[in-house]
């Protein structure tokens, strides 16, 4: 069970959609809108988990996950720059896997080919490279590696 004294893991609140959009804009070249985050927060087939600093309540990392039947896709996962280097992304991914609906047996994600740290983290969690999506990312343009984990360990 994922536990850290310095972080609280929970789902995003509707009041945080604008802040998530702001963080998203700082981190990704192709950011999601506030409306997109609101839609995900209220969706019955999407999750928007966050890792918040236990003392301050400040969001340290966030993700956006969608699922249909037995398959999930991690659409976003990011650590706020000032919180990087503390294993927070790893902890959030572990929390996601522990809290994803029981019927999910496969998780997919795309990752920038240049994001070696994230690729290594995913491999350590048992994800494998399934393929490549040419020119998937913009700003800057880059290929994505499609990674998958066939069975979520419970």
Each model region followed by its residue ranges:
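Short acidic/glycine-enriched loop/turn segments that link adjacent beta-strands
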Residues: 45, 70, 115, 137-143
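Short acidic/polar active-site loop segments enriched in Thr and Asp
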Residues: 70, 105, 128
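Conserved glycine-rich acetyl-CoA-binding loop
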Residues: 77-94, 112-120, 124-125
């Amino acid at each position: 069970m994922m536990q850290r004294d310095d972080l609280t893991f929970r789902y995003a609140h509707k009041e945080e959609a604008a802040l998530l959009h702001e963080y998203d804009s700082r981190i990704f070249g192709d950011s999601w809108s506030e409306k997109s985050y609101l839609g995900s927060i209220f969706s019955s087939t999407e999750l928007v988990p966050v890792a918040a600093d236990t003392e301050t309540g400040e969001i340290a990392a966030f993700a956006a996950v969608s699922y249909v039947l037995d398959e999930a896709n991690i659409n976003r996962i990011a650590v706020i720059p000032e919180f990087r280097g503390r294993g927070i992304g790893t902890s959030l991914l572990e929390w996601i896997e522990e809290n994803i609906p029981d019927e999910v047996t496969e998780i997919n994600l795309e990752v920038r080919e240049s994001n070696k740290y994230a690729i290594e983290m995913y491999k350590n969690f048992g994800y494998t490279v399934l393929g490549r999506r040419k020119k998937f990312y913009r700003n800057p343009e880059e290929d994505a590696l499609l990674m998958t984990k066939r069975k979520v360990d419970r």
